[in-house]
Curated annotation (Swiss-Prot):
This is CTP synthase. The gene is pyrG. Pathway: Pyrimidine metabolism; CTP biosynthesis via de novo pathway; CTP from UDP: step 2/2. One of its GO terms (biological process) is 'de novo' CTP biosynthetic process. Keywords: ATP-binding, Glutamine amidotransferase, Ligase, Magnesium, Metal-binding, Nucleotide-binding, Pyrimidine biosynthesis. The active site is at C380 (nucleophile), H518, E520. One of its GO terms (cellular component) is cytosol.
Length: 554
């Protein structure tokens, strides 16, 4: 039976439960434990796949094609375990499962209720996702006191009652606000948050106190007294300059030891080696170079919509001790501009998106980068924009477009994928009338790279696998025509049916590459991703006015 750490949040949302949980997980992993993580989200959507990026932020995709909460991106950036559909569960999915069972007659005519049927299904999902691991951390979305979270809190209360403290731990993240006028940290919100938890039968074992500054020992003692939590289990989580330094901070305060002692794991663990995280923090704090990258997107007012892209760019810089400054530009604004915003930029990245709003701005951005020899990296919709640009302005295919935006285009160089093969070898089909949810080409897919190309050089191997999330694809009818016009197709699906990567010859452009997949989902601060590392290096070379003499390594 896997020991479980349940992480809840109080007072306000967005305190950083995911980062705190992932940081603890990284320490436990460094001590030799096999760790997994899970997110329980209280919203009624089955998954976030059809939710607006402005409301929910990024949709993070796992190897098996699950469309999940962006917190799973945090988890995978901090731990080595690759997550799956099992690790992201919503209220909508729980109810969908229960209703399906009721329709099948699995409940034998019983009245289906929140307790026990909904809570039992939550517990079943927890058991399924965490089996076979030494420790599992489970984040409960939302804030204690929200009506939506109650079934999840009841379910984890039942787990603790049945398994005991040696197999289930409650960790509560709460706000300790600093009142500048009084010059004091206030503990009352934390006391009330714990009181709310205790009213539903949950007594926290550990408190993580988020604040602008370190919580002094006197306040920690006060919090411990009023919340019935051991003083050594009241952990200070102040604001820090580098989020990737959180594992080092939590290790310093001994949070991992609390887990080891409560779960009696002493015989399984070694000393924690966080040298990789120390190197990451050092590279962030002491860069040797600096570049500015323009990110031309549709949802730039809500930058969480591109969370993994932003992090992957920074990871690419970390690997060469380079600070990456991001300049966020709204694609729609560029449609009516002279592209002055792209002057003095070291590199341009156009990320994914859906719909026609801002697409012409992305096409014009590709054209600008191509003509002005600015390093260009297109991802998903950014690749499609690059293909449309090349078709219109180089291959002379007037009015070329994607059928997503213009179904009457005389040259639909980007079209709907009607059939493709999944990672398991099964054939999936869809058409214009298919549901939006869960009908895309999703998950990890292999592709073969063309020898002698930039993509092949960056990856360093012939076959690679990347995660996908898209409905539209390069139209194969235009392959020959665009290749004859000079476009290089450097990556294709293993069955040669889908174009995965396009680029420009290096004798015509220093660095112009676009891919249909989402490589940002496989980038981590400790390893980076070859495409992002190569892109940042190209930006450095543009800034330096030529080839770099030597590589700086983190």
């Amino acid at each position: 039976m896997t020991p479980l750490i349940f992480v809840t949040g109080g007072v306000v949302s967005s305190l950083g439960k995911g980062i705190a949980a992932a940081s603890l997980a990284s320490i436990l992993e460094a001590r030799g434990l096999k760790v997994t993580m899970m997110k329980l989200d209280p919203y009624i959507n089955v998954d976030p796949g059809t939710m607006s990026p402005f409301q929910h932020g990024e949709v993070y995709v796992t190897d098996d094609g699950a469309e999940t909460d962006l917190d799973l991106g945090h988890y995978e950036r901090y731990v080595r375990t690759r997550l799956s559909r099992k690790n992201s569960v919503t209220t909508g999915r729980i109810y969908e499962n229960v209703i399906r069972k009721e329709r099948r007659g699995d409940y034998l005519g019983a009245t289906v209720q929140v307790i026990p049927h909904i809570t039992d299904e939550i517990r079943r999902c927890i058991d399924e996702a965490t089996a076979g691991f030494d420790v599992a951390l489970i984040e409960i979305g939302g804030t204690v006191g929200d009506i939506e979270s109650l079934p999840f809190l009841e379910a984890i209360r039942q787990v603790r009652t049945e398994r005991g403290a040696e197999k289930a731990m409650f960790m509560h993240l709460t706000l300790v606000p600093y009142i500048a006028a009084a010059g004091e940290l206030k503990t009352k919100p934390t006391q009330h948050s714990v009181k709310e938890l205790r009213s539903i039968g949950i007594q926290p074992d550990v408190l993580l106190c988020r604040s602008e500054q370190a919580v002094p020992d006197s306040e920690r003692r006060k919090i411990a007294l009023f919340t019935n939590v051991s003083e050594r289990a009241v952990i200070s989580c102040p604001d820090i300059d580098v989020l990737y330094g959180m594992p080092l901070e939590l290790l310093r305060q001994g949070l991992d030891e609390l887990v080891i002692v409560q779960f009696k794991l002493r015989d399984k663990v070694a000393a924690a080696d966080l040298s990789e995280w120390a190197a990451v923090v050092d590279a962030v704090k002491h860069p040797l170079d600096e570049v500015t990258i323009a990110v031309v997107g549709k949802y730039v007012d809500h930058q969480d919509a591109y969370k993994s892209v932003a992090e992957a760019l920074r990871h690419g810089g970390l690997r060469q001790r380079t600070k990456v400054n991001l300049k966020w530009l709204e694609a729609q604004d560029l449609e009516r501009s002279d592209m002055a915003a792209l002057q003095d930029i070291d590199g341009i990245l156009v990320p994914g998106g859906f719909g026609d709003r801002g697409f012409e701005g992305k096409v014009q951005t590709s054209k600008f980068a191509r003509e002005h020899k600015v390093p260009y990296f297109g991802i998903c919709y950014g690749m499609q924009a690059a293909v449309v640009d090349y078709a219109r302005h180089v291959a002379d295919l007037d009015a070329a477009n994607s059928t997503e935006n213009d179904r009457q285009s005389p040259h639909p160089v980007i079209g709907l994928i009607t059939e493709w093969r999944t990672a398991t070898g099964e054939v999936e089909k869809r058409d214009e009338k298919s549901d939006l949810g869960g009908t895309m080409r999703l998950g990890l897919q292999e592709q073969r790279l063309k020898p002698g190309t930039l993509a092949r050089e960056l990856y360093g191997k012939d076959v690679v696998a990347e995660r996908h999330r898209h409905r539209y694809e390069f139209n194969n009818r235009y392959r020959t025509q665009l290749e004859d016009a000079g476009l290089v197709i450097s990556g294709k699906s293993m069955d040669d049916t889908l174009v995965e990567v396009v680029e420009l010859p290096r004798d015509t452009h220093p660095w112009f590459l676009a891919c249909q997949a989402h490589p940002e989902f496989l980038s981590t601060p400790r390893d980076g991703h070859p495409l992002f590392i190569g892109f940042v290096r190209a930006a450095r070379e543009k800034k330096a006015g030529g080839k770099l003499l030597k590589e700086a390594r983190a």
